[in-house]
Amino acid sequence: SPAKTRKKLRGKRFVFTSAQNNTHVHSDFLSSLENYCEVNEAELLVGTFHYNKKGFQRGGEDGDWFDPKIRKYILDESCEVFKDLLWCGELNILPTAANPLSGFHSYTQGASGIVPHAKVQLESLPSPKHDPCRMLYTTGAVTQRNYVKMKAGLKANFHHVFGAVVAEVDEDGDWFVRQLICNSD
């Protein structure tokens, strides 16, 4: 079972975002996230995704790179953030996906999940009457817009959000998730 081998994060507050290969970060937004983490005693974690502008996918091969400014934050594996909340950093979903959470409703096996993706999305998942509610969140991205100027790329460019997700737990073990969205200021 993946749950038995899944790494458990240590801490009370985390900031999750995503980054595209071969793309520079939005420096001001990254600086804001780093400052937020310092002030709020949070850990910044970045999930990566691959997008090949030449029209075919070769994710992870030589020639792919990630901005050196975020390398120390990259976590591309499944982790338990808190009880019943998972970081799905192993997922590599194309940024052109119209509905990045499609097909993942049962992926977290009864837990809520945070998925690295450039589009911000939140979905409430069905759960039995007396069970806690389950949610799936996407993060937004810390990297610049960088898409092919074709239909799917133009739509992805429009929906690209400089954003992140904050997850924190209180002293009772209850966790809370909220989204951070970069504005033009």
Q: Model-flagged regions — what are they?
A:
Residues 1-185:
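Extended recognition/assembly regions associated with phosphoester-bond processing machinery
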